[in-house]
């Protein structure tokens, strides 16, 4: 999954405009990494601890808690993806974001990559609301990262290039999710599945209008599913 894969997969994504030299450098990925690091640093300052930063006021206000979403705090569906619990958590996710994202951003383009990232993040959060404990605190960019895994896999499938390494990475991470305590299976699988659907629209649909429409419909479906589920609990 190194830079060499950019040259082989760039032709897999339909695009109309020729690429400029500036388009070969990732911009969104470094910005996302910087934003995640800044949020982590702020929670650590508030909590006065790198390890126990979940005690920060910002963390409590932004973390995904299905019960809080039911009370109208819908922003948590996205803000939770920029929170991390401890240095190891953010280090692993930011490394994965960089390794996966630097190539995908160049291949998909900045706007489509950011859309894939955010829709995958929303998919992971939706799965937590639908299937996890309603009073559970969930945080992290892992749902979005799993969506990027799906994105890279589908790009390679589209180009008919070997994708066994990506499948192995996905399986390994799912196994880790299952065996390591405290990791949200719902969030990871939700990001993987929803990211796959979003990536399929971006990779296989030829017209930008169709791509945008598919992502909007997917987003609306996720929000409707959450709203219906929460209404049924009331």
Model segments located where?
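C-terminal transmembrane module of polytopic alpha-helical membrane proteins
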Residues: 1-21, 178-234
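N-terminal TM1-TM2 helical hairpin plus the immediately adjacent luminal interfacial "cap"
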Residues: 25-141, 181-183
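Residue-level signature of the transmembrane alpha-helical core
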Residues: 37, 78, 118-122, 144, ...
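Alpha-helical membrane-inserting segments
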Residues: 38-42, 123, 127, 131, ...
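Short alpha-helical packing/oligomerization segments
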Residues: 68-70, 76-77, 169-193
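Alpha-helical transmembrane segments that form the membrane-embedded catalytic/substrate-binding core
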Residues: 90-97, 139-151, 183-203
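Alpha-helical transmembrane bundle and helix-membrane interface signal
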Residues: 106-107, 152-167, 203-215
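Central hydrophobic cores of alpha-helical transmembrane segments
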Residues: 117-120, 165-174, 214-221
